Amino acid sequence: MTGKKRSASSSRWLQEHFSDKYVQQAQKKGLRSRAWFKLDEIQQSDKIFKPGMTVVDLGAAPGGWSQYAVTQIGNSGRIIACDLLPMDPIVGVDFLQGDFRDELVLKALLERVGDSKVQVVMSDMAPNMCGTPAVDIPRAMYLVELALEMSRDVLAPGGSFVVKVFQGEGFDEYLREIRSLFTKVKVRKPDSSRARSREVYIVATGRKP
């Protein structure tokens, strides 16, 4: 952006971002991102984490969710995280950098999980947004379908699935699909999620055998 003026929309986004109380709190607390607060709100309402759990974190960078989950599962727990972008190390987190859509990366991720099942699969994945819902929503739905497929492969009976979804075409069908696989499903809009954002979080607990 050197030598060019920022667009009005990007300037508005930056102003909103840095004046956001959750961004400011995250900076004060030394947290990786404001996403920490979203997962904290979900944990307070749905109690998905317990000490000793194994957790898969998809779309993990910069590490807000992994950073929070570590505090809940303790030293006896384990987190296997994956993202296309790099992520600074977090004690207790086994991080794999790569594109989750790539078969080799997926295979490496499954190898890290191993034969034992996990108790939580969580996904904060989102595509690069262009601002056109007709393009953005299908891209986002593709990622959440992949996350659900991962949960089918690795989640233990009784386990939980937490996924960020953008409301739009395909959302209702996706929600029905999740309801067929879990005993309890809630749609959450945390206070720390920006009001104008289409994002919501589906919290599914009690994976059916």
From Swiss-Prot:
Cellular-component GO terms for this entry: cytoplasm
Enzyme class: transferase
GO molecular function: rRNA (uridine-2'-O-)-methyltransferase activity
UniProt subcellular location: Cytoplasm
Keyword Acyltransferase: no
Residues binding S-adenosyl-L-methionine: G63, W65, D83, D99, D124
Annotated Pfam families: FtsJ (PF01728)
Top-level taxon: Bacteria
EC number: 2.1.1.166
Xref: InterPro entries: RNA_methyltr_RlmE, RNA_MeTrfase_FtsJ_dom, rRNA-MeTfrase_E, rRNA_MeTrfase_gammaproteobac, SAM-dependent_MTases_sf
Catalytic reaction(s) noted: uridine(2552) in 23S rRNA + S-adenosyl-L-methionine = 2'-O-methyluridine(2552) in 23S rRNA + S-adenosyl-L-homocysteine + H(+)
Key words of the record: Cytoplasm, Methyltransferase, rRNA processing, S-adenosyl-L-methionine, Transferase
Signal peptide as annotated in the record: none
Active site annotation, chain numbering: K164
Protein family: Belongs to the class I-like SAM-binding methyltransferase superfamily. RNA methyltransferase RlmE family.
Function: Specifically methylates the uridine in position 2552 of 23S rRNA at the 2'-O position of the ribose in the fully assembled 50S ribosomal subunit.
Name of the molecule in the record: Ribosomal RNA large subunit methyltransferase E
Organism from which the protein derives: Klebsiella pneumoniae subsp. pneumoniae (strain ATCC 700721 / MGH 78578)
